[in-house]
Design a protein with these regions (language model features):
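Extended, low-polarity segments enriched in aliphatic/aromatic residues
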Residues: 1-30, 36-258
């Protein structure tokens, strides 16, 4: 399911239609965002949208934590981008995945390390920064999870990967690792809700604001929609083709089972 809205009342109607409203009542909610330290032309989750989602959760009987991998600086980064009042108002838990213990999950032969705390939250929401920056892959819901695993588990002793890449092991076979990591998290602690809106970045036009907010339950469907509607002048990422093929294979197998 993929729904869009141009205003808050319709957005909240869409939350209800995808099942978010009923899911959050009396539940703990985990929100995965994209928020590194400030860099020019560096994508980040739209803070206005994030504030709306947090307020919606608490107004409907839930409570939440926010997570991202920031080498211990997630709270500081949130404050830098104007989120301090919300953190205090709701006493939100901040989880920097780089400091968390993890479980090993094998996905298509690749070893991945998923934070154990993810399973403590029955409801999981992804709010990425929709972007395609120079010399980087198109990034939205699926690639968001590159920042959902501890950096210490993805280092290499000797690497040709450029200095500054936080998880070099993931870059040895980049597109395959994007797909495998997404499926590892899906099997261990699936994120059921995806919200795309607000600030976005396209290498050909720079920063822009999405006129609609898009919500859904299927990360691949939403990634494909956002790419074809807002990034068709950019390079299409192979990891989406990998996931499309795997999804089609699973569906074909399911249909063949009596």
């Amino acid at each position: 399911m993929l729904l869009s809205s141009k205003n808050d009342p319709k957005l909240y109607d869409n939350f209800e239609e995808i099942g978010l409203k009923s899911a959050i009542k009396n539940n703990d909610v985990l929100i995965k965002i994209n928020l590194g330290a400030y860099q020019k032309n560096h994508p980040r989750t739209d803070m206005t949208l994030l504030k709306k989602v947090v307020a919606y959760i608490y107004n409907h009987g839930g409570k939440c934590a926010i997570t991202e991998g920031c080498s211990g600086f997630l709270t500081e980064n949130l404050i830098t981008f104007g989120f301090e009042d919300i953190l205090k108002q709701y006493n939100i838990k901040v989880i920097d995945v780089d400091l968390e213990e993890c479980d090993e999950v094998i996905s298509y032969g690749e070893y991945h390390y998923i934070p154990k705390c993810f399973q403590e939250y029955p409801v999981r929401i992804a709010i990425p920064a929709t972007s395609k920056s120079n010399d980087m892959l198109y990034s939205n819901n699926i690639k968001l999870f590159f920042g959902a695993v501890p950096r210490k588990m993805y280092q290499l002793d000797d690497s040709d990967i450029p200095i500054g890449v936080p998880r070099p092991k993931l870059h040895q076979n980049l597109h395959l690792s994007v797909a495998n990591l997404f499926l590892a998290i899906k099997s261990y602690s699936e994120f059921q809700y995806y919200i795309n809106g607000g600030l976005a970045y396209n290498e050909n036009i720079g920063e822009f604001i999405l006129s609609d907010t898009f919500v859904g339950n299927n990360a691949l469907e939403l990634d494909l929609y956002m790419f074809h509607n807002f990034f068709s002048n950019c390079e299409f990422p192979n990891y989406l083709d990998i996931l499309k093929t795997r999804t089609e294979t699973v569906l074909a197998v399911d249909r063949s089972v009596p």
